[in-house]
A protein has these predicted regions:
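Short His-Asn-centered micro-motif
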Residues: 51-54, 69, 106, 145, ...
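N-terminal subdomain of lithium-sensitive/metallo-dependent phosphomonoesterases centered on the IMPase/IPPase/PAP
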Residues: 1-72
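DPxDG-like acidic metal-binding loop motif
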Residues: 61-119
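Residue-level signal for inorganic ion chemistry
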Residues: 27, 75, 116, 178, ...
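Short, conserved micro-motifs enriched in small and acidic residues
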Residues: 21-29, 79-81, 169, 194, ...
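An extended, acidic
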Residues: 41-42, 120, 131-252
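Buried hydrophobic packing segments
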Residues: 34, 38, 87, 91, ...
């Protein structure tokens, strides 16, 4: 689907997808490739179901394992030709985020991949994730934010405590970079779809990171569905998360 990125053909809009967003040709093309590969797995006798942001739920003979597919996380970037978008795959053995036992986030532009298996750690490019040490303990080096304009205003206390901010426009890639320590903190101060986070939250957990909503509640028990939404505050370790949560708490 890369040849479609940033083109008029790739921006052609279709009906609203299962996730509630308008499906574009770049989404359809990427999903077709993924579903074709999963159908080939089913033909070899594997039983599972697939839940895609574009086409919804499809059964291949069993409710679980359930494969979550976001074929293009960062669709607007892809439409505009901004090379920051990725493929998110998560495999669950139950209905909640905590039930994610395998996850993959692929940067479709660079080919860089983050993977995680429950209780087996997280990897970036095949190597176990090693978080970059933080030098300045007084401020966050880089704060990552969700991309809606209101997020900047709502996260202002965190912004004022940070040296730099980054807004990638891809939830999966943002959390993946947090898991590997690129972001000291990532914040989505407005409710975002839990479905988009499933693979990245496993990466974060397996790498030793922490994720909660802005009130400090774990997001793991939430249903990993297309209609479940939550705020999000995550960091690559408990110390940074506690610091960020304290700052957000002062705002309330």
């Amino acid at each position: 689907m890369l040849p479609l990125a940033g083109t008029e053909a790739g921006s052609v809009r279709f009906e609203v997808g299962a996730g509630g967003d308008r499906t574009m040709e770049v989404d359809r093309a990427a999903e077709a490739v993924v579903l074709s590969e999963l159908a080939a797995v089913a033909e070899r006798g594997e039983l599972f179901s697939v839940l895609s942001e574009e086409s919804g739920l499809r059964s291949f003979g069993a409710d679980y394992p359930l494969v979550l597919v976001d074929p293009v996380d960062g669709s607007l970037n892809a439409k505009q030709g901004v090379p920051v978008f990725g493929l998110m795959l998560a495999v669950l053995d139950g209905p909640t985020v905590d039930d994610t036992f395998a996850g993959s986030v692929l940067n479709l532009n660079t080919g860089e991949e983050w993977t995680a298996i429950r209780k087996q750690g997280a990897r970036r490019g095949g190597a176990l994730i090693s978080v970059i040490p933080r030098d300045d303990r007084k401020r966050f080096q880089i704060l990552g934010l969700e991309s809606s304009p209101r997020a900047l205003k709502l996260a202002q206390p965190l912004v004022e405590h940070s040296n730099k901010i980054r807004i990638l426009g891809s939830m999966a890639l943002s959390i993946a970079h947090t898991a590997s320590g690129g972001f000291d903190v990532f914040c989505a101060p407005m409710p975002v779809r839990v479905f988009d986070m499933a693979a990245s939250l496993l990466l974060l957990s397996e790498a030793g990171g922490v994720a909660t909503d802005l009130q400090g509640n774990r997001v793991g028990p939430l249903p990993a569905s297309l209609d479940t939404r939550t705020t999000l505050l995550c960091a690559p370790n408990e110390g940074l998360h506690a610091e960020a949560l304290a700052i957000v708490g002062k705002q309330g």
